[in-house]
Amino acid sequence: MVRVIYSKEFEQDVKKVRDKAVKERMIKQVEKILKNPEIGKPLRYNLKGERSVYVSPYRLVYALVDDKIFLLRFRHRDDVYE
């Protein structure tokens, strides 16, 4: 069974989002990730090993390690990769 681990940075990012519709879409994307962990776009360069899914207008960045999914960041697409 896959285990989900939330980073502190991810939790802080989610708290900043006030739009409930965005949070609901984010939850649906997390459910999709649980069903198929490789659904996200693989990232490159210094973010190699991480994946990203789009939750308009945000990006959810996560990493899959063994049977664990680490939710790393949930930020606006303009500054998520900084």
Identify the meaning behind each predicted range.
Residues M1-Q12, K16, K20-E24, V55-R59, ...:
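Enriched for short, Lys/Arg-rich terminal
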Residues S7-F10, K28-Q29, E38:
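A short alpha-helix capping/helix-coil boundary motif
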Residues K23, I27-E31:
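Short, well-structured alpha-helical segments
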Residues V30-Y54:
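A short, surface-exposed loop/turn module that caps and links secondary-structure elements
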